[in-house]
Amino acid sequence: MDNNNDDLHYCSFCNKAQNEVDKLITNSSDGLKVFICNECIELSHKAISQKKGGSFNSDYMSDVKLLLKKPEDIKIFLSKHVVGQEHAQHVLSVAMYNHCQSMAQFNAISDVEIEKSNVMLIGPTGSGKTLLAKTLAKVSDVPFAMADATTLTEAGYVGDDVESVLSRLLQAANYDVAKAQRGIVFIDEIDKITRKSESTSITRDVSGEGVQQALLKIMEGTVAYVPPQGGRKHPQQEFIQVDTNNILFICGGAFEGLNKIIEARKKGTSVGFGADISQSKEQKKKNTLHDVQPEDLIKFGLIPEFVGRVPITAVLDELDHEDLVHVLIEPRNALIKQYKALLAFSKVNLEFSDEAISAIAEKAMSYKTGARMLRAILESLLLDVMYTAGNGGFEGSTIVITKEMVELGKAVINHNNKGNVITVND
């Protein structure tokens, strides 16, 4: 068949023209254009379904969504849920786009094997590392699992082995192996399992280098044997085989002290005309972390092989007062929106003054845990209000949270409400 007709596109698999099939789907990249028709998609899915089962419609639509998501689309979605961290959003958008493209196996056309690139998120507590990873899974419509690296131990020791991470991913995918095999795993506190020293110790490092080595095996791509219900393996147990080649691993950690390692490497390079002596200590630390190199992570205590399997690094900045105000009011699932919705079920209109919102952010900053304390502050502040509203009180009323209430730590209500507005007691 002559494929030189400029007016027609052809399926790259069966060579049928676009006017011979119902649908012809292409990738959105500017490079090699690849086309696949609906008939080839159906045939491929049937071949897979005979062994693994599954629903054509859900799998087909999910795959199409993966193909059509551009980095810009991913970033727009992330920005609706995460405040700030523009650089991290940019990095993750590109990383997820490339990961989806490799999963679509366009590389099979060009005979180029594309290896996945796992991601390292470096940032202080409460800066949004976990939220970014969760939101990335949501925009990509893939299962998501999270693990705390400090709970993992190498095989033969008490604790969770690394396969337990994959068990959680299977559970998130409702034990659909094919779906789990393209999911996202977020491993938090990765900085807590660093090697204690650069020299080899004769004692076993149960939760340090040994765990890095164990994680390395599943992160670089292997067929793992996963206990169906999690927990430790035992001989009588049946295992589920999970191919980790297309699972995206995102690691996160605060890496306290990493800035000092970077500064030591750069010592002397900022002296003279290039030095900015006007920078604050916090600004200097922030800018330093953005210069992190693989050698710095190795010096910190990650083994070279592990660093090599997490080639993409994104640094998250500490949230300031303005950021915390935005966290409270701007995202699609902003905390204040959530509490207003909760009280709306009891027919109570909840409002916050601008000064109250600012005071909540100020109080959260005093804990030095980023956005993590915001919910706890609001829970304590609104406890009595939610209790009374849940019992039918305040129905049809408007409650205005003021700065004084925030400073007091709870919303003290004046039951002699005037103009349907309930205020703090004098």
Curated annotation (Swiss-Prot):
Belongs to the ClpX chaperone family. HAMAP family: ClpX (MF_00175). PANTHER family: ATP-DEPENDENT CLP PROTEASE ATP-BINDING SUBUNIT CLPX-LIKE, MITOCHONDRIAL, ATP-DEPENDENT CLP PROTEASE ATP-BINDING SUBUNIT CLPX-LIKE, MITOCHONDRIAL-RELATED. ATP binds at P124, T125, G126, S127, G128, K129, T130, L131. One of its GO terms (cellular component) is HslUV protease complex. PROSITE patterns: CLPX_ZB. One of its GO terms (molecular function) is ATP binding. This is ATP-dependent Clp protease ATP-binding subunit ClpX. Component of the ClpX-ClpP complex. Forms a hexameric ring that, in the presence of ATP, binds to fourteen ClpP subunits assembled into a disk-like structure with a central cavity, resembling the structure of eukaryotic proteasomes. Pfam families: AAA_2 (PF07724), ClpB_D2-small (PF10431), zf-C4_ClpX (PF06689). Zn(2+) binds at C11, C14, C37, C40. ATP-dependent specificity component of the Clp protease. It directs the protease to specific substrates. Can perform chaperone functions in the absence of ClpP. Disulfide bonds: none annotated. Keywords: ATP-binding, Chaperone, Metal-binding, Nucleotide-binding, Zinc. Residues 1-56 form the ClpX-type ZB domain.
